[in-house]
UniProtKB/Swiss-Prot annotation:
GO terms for molecular function: manganese ion transmembrane transporter activity. Keywords: Cell membrane, Ion transport, Manganese, Membrane, Transmembrane, Transmembrane helix, Transport. This is Putative manganese efflux pump MntP. It is found in: Cell membrane. Probably functions as a manganese efflux pump.
């Protein structure tokens, strides 16, 4: 898998965590660096682990002979479906975001958000098993990219950038749809 695809995929799955970090960052009032690092770390770890789990599930199914004939369609549908859902969610979520008034990063809500934003990475990991992508490289890239973007997102949110979260999710969704289309297109040409 080309490096540019790895980076685009990583940015695509990190979009939800980035948007959540912006929202959470609006509530961080003290210990900004420490709390932003904790939040970004939680998101990064989840985004690194979930595609590995998804890849393991997908690998089992990818080895079944009847699925090999349609593996490119499965990867496309998973990526396009996740991307479309991200775009839908960006326009159909409540404006009332659950923020913490004290500015503290409470562990339980942060873990729940980490899990919720990484479900997409689980599905992407499943899709990547069908195209035999290098999951360790992808998982590390997804985790690191999510960590960095979440750190930036928390900082942006703290400094009044809450209005960018929804658009980040839309762009991430479009990237995933584009990558799914690229997998399908490459398979049909090759």
């Amino acid at each position: 898998m080309p490096l540019v695809h790895v980076m685009l995929l990583s940015c695509g799955v990190a979009a939800d965590a980035f948007a959540c970090s912006i929202a959470r960052g609006t509530a961080i009032r003290v210990n900004i660096i420490k709390r932003s690092l904790i939040l970004a770390g939680i998101f990064g770890v989840f985004q690194a682990l979930m595609p590995v789990i998804g890849w393991g599930i997908g690998y089992f199914f990818a080895e079944l002979s009847f699925i090999r004939a349609i593996d490119h369609w499965v990867a496309f549908l998973l990526l396009a479906g996740v991307g479309a859902k991200m775009i839908w969610d960006a326009f159909h979520q409540d404006a009332d975001v659950d923020v913490i008034d004290t500015g503290a990063v409470q562990l339980r809500p942060a873990l729940i958000l980490g899990l919720a934003t990484s479900i997409d990475a689980l599905a992407v990991g499943m899709g990547m098993a069908f195209v035999h992508a290098p999951i360790i490289t992808l998982a590390l890239a997804m985790g690191l990219t999510t960590f960095v973007l979440s750190l930036v997102g928390a900082w942006m949110g703290h400094h009044g950038g809450g209005r960018f979260g929804g658009w980040a999710t839309v762009i991430g969704g479009l990237v995933l749809i584009g990558l799914g289309g690229n997998i399908l297109f490459d398979h049909m040409l090759g």
